[in-house]
């Protein structure tokens, strides 16, 4: 299958490109820069110059492909509304390009991106095999620059690793290589109009994460109140407090997906986070 991938040079995208090619697919990745194009060609993929705002390139990439995996997003949180608008237009353009073809369109769910999600779900009525994957809060592994590295940085700065209350609130996670396989399986076999939760760890007690960080940094671990969470964790205050279990039983059953890579706690213990 010839697959058009947005976000192909990103943290998850590079793993998805490798997973697709390893399983016999041909990949065309959207890229904005010469460096991105070189990264793709070095991996054995083709590069299509463009951006998420370049609707002509998105339409061409989708029309010339047998399927699309949409991972790209403009992470400009100072202009988040604009980023969401760009995503809606991009998703609309690509799903329109696949109309009445029966071809797959797999998108990652974005926080606050319900309008894009609705377009993907509606595309099932227009002859597109649209599906959405909502990944766990932490997509961990080598090269992670997300929430967990921020928790480690905060513990360094504060001199202790913290959890809120009794720390029983749960944090879902998935290894980036397991996520890559999940996107491939959805591309190959997801029914139209399906929404999947992509979690290997469906809910790790936040206290366990804090204790592992404290252990690896040789720092004390202590509880803080919910009122103090924002001051301690900054923008992560709410996420560090919420109970967010995300079961993936249906995902595993429908897509025959089984996580194979280290859990978040094992990755923290033996991975690259503290090198």
What feature does the model see in each segment?
Residues 50, 237-275:
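C-terminal amphipathic/interface module of NAD(P)-dependent oxidoreductases
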């Amino acid at each position: 299958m010839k697959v058009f991938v947005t976000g192909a040079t990103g943290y998850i995208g590079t793993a998805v490109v490798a997973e697709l090619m390893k399983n016999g697919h041909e990949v065309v990745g959207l890229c904005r820069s010469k460096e991105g194009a070189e990264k793709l060609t070095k991996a054995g993929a083709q590069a299509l110059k463009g951006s998420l705002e370049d609707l002509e390139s998105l339409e061409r990439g989708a029309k010339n492909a047998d399927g699309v995996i949409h991972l790209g997003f403009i992470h400009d949180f100072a202009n988040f509304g604009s980023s969401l608008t760009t995503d809606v237009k991009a998703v609309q353009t690509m799903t329109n390009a696949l109309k009445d073809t029966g071809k797959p369109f797999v998108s990652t769910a974005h926080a606050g991106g319900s309008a894009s999600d609705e377009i993907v779900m509606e595309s099932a009525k227009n002859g597109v095999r649209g599906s959405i994957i909502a990944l766990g809060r932490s997509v961990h592994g080598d090269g992670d620059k997300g929430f967990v590295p921020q928790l480690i940085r905060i513990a360094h700065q504060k001199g202790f690793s913290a959890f809120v209350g009794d720390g029983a609130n749960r944090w879902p996670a998935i290894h980036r290589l397991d996520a890559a396989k999940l996107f491939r399986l959805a591309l190959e076999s997801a029914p139209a109009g399906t929404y999947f939760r992509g979690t290997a760890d469906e809910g790790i007690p936040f206290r366990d994460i804090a204790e592992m960080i404290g252990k690896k940094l040789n720092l004390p671990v202590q509880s803080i109140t919910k009122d103090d969470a924002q001051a301690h964790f900054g923008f992560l205050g709410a996420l560090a407090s919420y109970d967010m279990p995300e079961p993936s039983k249906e995902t595993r059953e429908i897509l025959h997906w089984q996580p194979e890579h280290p859990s978040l706690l094992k990755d923290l213990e033996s991975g690259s986070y503290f090198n």
